[in-house]
C-alpha cells in the first residue's frame, strides 16, 4: 500500500498592507499549489504580527535564544516556518528592497540558523510587486532568495514556457495605458501560479525521498 504524502506550503505576505497587490500574486501562487494533490496551503500576513528589529545582542550565537521573543510575535512565526515544508514569500519593492517588517523577520530568524540550520532542506520561492517596470522587483526577489540560501533552503523557480514565462512572479503597477492593479497583470498572475505549482511539486518530491 502506498503511503499518502502531504506537504504544507506557507505563503508569507511581507507587505504592510492587507489584501492589496502583493497578496493578489501570493494568493494566485497558493491557489495553484493547492491544486497539486497532497498539498495544503496557508497564507500568513506579517502585518498581523509584531516583530521587533534585531538589536545585535548575539545571544542566539551562544544558543541562549532571543530575548525579544518574549516581547513580540517572532516566537510564533519561527514555529510556523519550521512546521512548513515550503515557503513562498511575497513582498513589494520599497526603494528596491524589502519592507521593514519583512527585513525584521529575516534578521530575527537568525536563531533558526544558529540552532542547527532548522530551516535547511525546506523549499523557498519569492514573488514581488513594484510600481514601475524597473522598480526593484527583481532585487526584492533576489533578497528573499538570499535569505533562503543563508538558511540552507532549496530555491525553486517556475518552469513554464521558456520563451514567454519567467521563473518568478513579478508584478508591476505600470501598464502601457496607465496604472493598474496586479489583479489586472495577467503575466504576473500566470507566472505566480507557475511558481506555486512548481514549489508544491518539488516539496512533494523531496518529502517522498526521490531527490
Predicted feature locations:
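N-terminal beta1-alpha1-beta2 submodule of the flavodoxin-like/Rossmannoid cofactor-binding fold
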Residues: 1-118, 164-211
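Short, glycine-/small-residue-rich phosphate/pyrophosphate-handling segment
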Residues: 100, 118-163
Amino acid at each position: 500500500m502506498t503511503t499518502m504524502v502531504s506537504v504544507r506550503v506557507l505563503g508569507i505576505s511581507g507587505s504592510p498592507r492587507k489584501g492589496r497587490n502583493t497578496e493578489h500574486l501570493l494568493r494566485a501562487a497558493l491557489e495553484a499549489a493547492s491544486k497539486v494533490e497532497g498539498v495544503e496551503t496557508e497564507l500568513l500576513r506579517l502585518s498581523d504580527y509584531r516583530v521587533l528589529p534585531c538589536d545585535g545582542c548575539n545571544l542566539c550565537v551562544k544558543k541562549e535564544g532571543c530575548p525579544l521573543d518574549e516581547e513580540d510575535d517572532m516566537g510564533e512565526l519561527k514555529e510556523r516556518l519550521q512546521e512548513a515544508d515550503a515557503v513562498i514569500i511575497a513582498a513589494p519593492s520599497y526603494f528596491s528592497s524589502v519592507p521593514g517588517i519583512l527585513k525584521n523577520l529575516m534578521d530575527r530568524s537568525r536563531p533558526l540558523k544558529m540552532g542547527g540550520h532548522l530551516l535547511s532542506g525546506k523549499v523557498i520561492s519569492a514573488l514581488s510587486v513594484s510600481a514601475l517596470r524597473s522598480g526593484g522587483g527583481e532585487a526584492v526577489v533576489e533578497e528573499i532568495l538570499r535569505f533562503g540560501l543563508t538558511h540552507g533552503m532549496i530555491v525553486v523557480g517556475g518552469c513554464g514556457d521558456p520563451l514567454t514565462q519567467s521563473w518568478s512572479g513579478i508584478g508591476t503597477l505600470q501598464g502601457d495605458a496607465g496604472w493598474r492593479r496586479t489583479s489586472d497583470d495577467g503575466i504576473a498572475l500566470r507566472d505566480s501560479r507557475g511558481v506555486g505549482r512548481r514549489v508544491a511539486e518539488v516539496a512533494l518530491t523531496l518529502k517522498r525521498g526521490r531527490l
